[in-house]
Amino acid sequence: MALAELRKLVDPLPAPDSRGMLTTNIDKKKIDQTVAQIAQGGKASVLGLIEMLGEPGTVENSKPHFALHCVVNHALVTDNEKQRKEFCEALASQVANESLSTYNRAYLCQELQWAGRDEACPALGKALLNEALTDAEATALAAIGGERAASQLRTAMAKAEGKCRVNIIDALAALAVPQSAAIFKEAIKDRDREVRIAASIGLANISQADAANSLLAAAASAKGWERTQITKACLVLAEHLAAAGKKADARRIYESLKKTRSDKSEQHIKHAVELGLAAIA
């Protein structure tokens, strides 16, 4: 679809009011018809809408911004997998487009967060080390899920620092695929407290018995909030192991915590341990 033709379809769409909200000129039937017509243009329509995006907060940006979301959503509500994949490939191809504002590049990631699948992962992985985009990129990969997404995060983790490193390990912890175990065991010794805590959550979530040593050691040396969070991860791992029938492994974690949590401030941990031990007796 030619850009001029696309503009004619987009121009009648609702414009935001003085508060930046779409509250007037809302005719759902007409909007749905327009969106379906734009969607018929396939990948070219999506690329055209992206080209039309303007500066964040401007009227010029609002209509193509709205249309782009509606068109991507159209593929989902009509259950058109071929169209969904085609649209998401178009979105992914523009994530690295530096002629777009950071805001709009992040917006493309947000669309991929809920509409994207494996086809979006390589493009999302390429900008994980960009501090301005890392939030949107990592969140999208975590939402897509699976090893294809996790592998992109693990690759980026090797070079990530600061905010990017925290976002990436958080996303890996949410995905909790077994292939990330080695990264979690290394990251739990990281110099950044937030990275260590996220790594402990990842180790708890992958539910592997051999993660217990790393978690217990980290919890023993931690203080304050970090000690609380990593101890909680130890308890979560024990619960997962018990649920999987690995009672001996769960018991070892509980017994270790029982011996080391003697301070009055950690009596609630001892109580949780007693409940856990009773459940696997």
Predicted feature descriptions by range:
Residues 19-20, 55-59, 94-98:
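Helix-loop junctions that connect tandem helical modules in alpha-solenoid scaffolds
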Residues 5-9, 48-53, 90-95, 123-125, ...:
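Buried hydrophobic core positions in alpha-solenoid tandem helical repeats
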Residues 1-33:
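N-terminal "cap/leader" segments of large eukaryotic alpha-helical scaffolds
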Residues 24-41, 61-82, 102-117, 123-126, ...:
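Structural detector for internal amphipathic alpha-helices that build alpha-solenoid repeat scaffolds
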Residues 44-61:
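Short, charge-rich amphipathic alpha-helical segments embedded
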